[in-house]
Amino acid sequence: IITIDCGIKANEQIESANEKGIDVIICDHHIPDNSIPKAYSIINPNQKNCNYPFKGLCGCGIGFKLISAIEKKSGGIEEVNQYLDLVAIATIADQMPMINENRAIVKYGLKVLNKNPRPGFHFFIRSINREIVESDISFNIGPRINASGRMKSGMISVELMTETNTNKAYKIAQEIESTNLLRRAKEKEVTEEAIKKTDPLKFTNVVYAADWNKGVLGIAASRLVDKFYKPTIVLTLENKIYTGSARSVANFDIYDAIDSGKKYLDQYGGHKYAAGLSIKQENLQGFIDHFESYVKNAVGNKMFAKTISYDI
């Protein structure tokens, strides 16, 4: 089993795989706990004592490092470059910092995308009569790839990216386009309801409901951050457990804030600006109070203020 963008906290699952004689290789960029899984190999630049110089790769970027190393060992490296478009899209869609290696990944990934776009991607960019740039990924391709996983199944997007027959790829893309329209409607609905639940006197926004679509919680959290500029968590109820997504503001580590309240949580994971978590119903209010107190103390009792950078 090779994991991409997950697995660094899956101690029990990997122990189960070990018992069945299955080797597991973890490719993940999320922050590990003190106890890491006993996997065959862990590739994560954010684990302790890792001397890899760049910590900002996305999960897909780390997977690309693995296949590049395998290809290099077998005597070549050119074969893997055809996948740089996928790595670039993942890097942009996961909002990784556009510095260091990520700049090179995106630069050369966009070259692959412009020179020979996969049939499924071509459906979405066919009306753009110029070179595809980073913003086209952020606002066009990325949200559509995400839509199927949020609303139906991520396998639909896998089929989109691997289908070489243009007609078949276009049919998959049309299905994804319809799913994306549904995603946008649900996102709007949840965001509007979530805004009504916010408290202007608090340093954080933690909002929840029993019937919100799980697939759009991360987007809704981002929308609330844009509007109110506060660390934000949006949750929905599923089998008596609140599950959801967290998003942060610039220069505030929301993972550390969530980690500080782990005694209230069932599960959690993520990184500085985005995280996921689940909480039993009876622990929700305790966590909300703790989270608010932690953030308030961390910022010195002053509300967050958005800064705008510009060239001079």
Model-derived regions, located:
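Hydrophobic helix-and-loop "lid/oligomerization" segment in the mid-to-C-terminal part
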Residues: I1, K20-G21, K38, E71-E292, ...
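Conserved phosphate-handling catalytic cores of large alpha/beta enzymes
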Residues: T3-M96, I258
